[in-house]
Design a protein with these regions (language model features):
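CoA-thioester-processing core
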Residues: 1-42, 56, 72, 76
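C-terminal long alpha-helix characteristic of the crotonase
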Residues: 3-8, 50, 59-107, 123, ...
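Glycine- (often His-adjacent) and acidic-residue-rich active-site loop
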Residues: 16-18, 102, 118
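Short, well-ordered beta-strand elements within core beta-sheets of diverse protein domains
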Residues: 38, 42-43, 59-64, 117-120
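Short alpha-helical scaffolding segments that buttress acidic/His motifs in well-ordered protein cores
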Residues: 41-42, 91-94, 132
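Acidic, divalent-metal-coordinating active-site segment for phosphoryl/phosphodiester hydrolysis
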Residues: 45-52
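Terminal low-complexity tails and localization/encapsulation signals of metabolic enzymes
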Residues: 129-145
Length: 145
């Protein structure tokens, strides 16, 4: 996840230096924002602003001010940390697998095989479902995954 300050810029300047962005930047950029935008960024060597990065899905959010960036990032981190640690671990792994695998089915299979049984038999799954049914906030246990 990317939270950018209003003055941040994003780009692949390699082409302007006589190089190519071969450290996995090109395929990642194409997956994030599509071939047209990735081509513009990679072939021109020009940077895009934080607002453009947000529009192109390179950034998740632009902070209100330069000074509020850390606080806004911490707020997002606290929200994530408020959820079941088991669910966060498995969800993050699934996201990474989807990012790295060419096939949606393959990514799903790897995540399911690695975590499903432990996640759904774990105490945090029961805690979360019970809290939902009781309309209260869950009190998570440390992850055992």
């Amino acid at each position: 996840m990317v939270i950018a300050s209003p003055s941040a810029t994003f780009g692949l300047p390699e082409v302007a230096r006589g190089l190519a962005a071969n450290a996995s930047g090109l395929p990642r950029l194409v997956r994030i924002c599509g071939l047209q935008i990735a081509s513009q960024i990679a072939l021109t060597g020009q940077s895009v602003s934080a607002e453009e990065a947000l529009k192109f899905n390179i950034a998740n959010k632009v902070s209100k001010t330069q000074d509020s960036l850390v606080q806004e990032a911490l707020e997002m981190a606290k929200l994530i940390a408020s959820h079941s640690p088991d669910a966060v671990i498995v969800t993050r792994s699934g996201l990474r697998e989807a990012w790295q695998q060419a096939s949606v089915e393959q990514a799903n299979r790897v995540t399911q095989d690695r975590y499903s049984k432990a996640l759904y038999k774990g105490e945090n799954a029961k805690i979360g479902l019970d809290a939902f049914a009781d309309k209260r906030l869950p009190k998570w246990l440390p992850s055992n995954l």
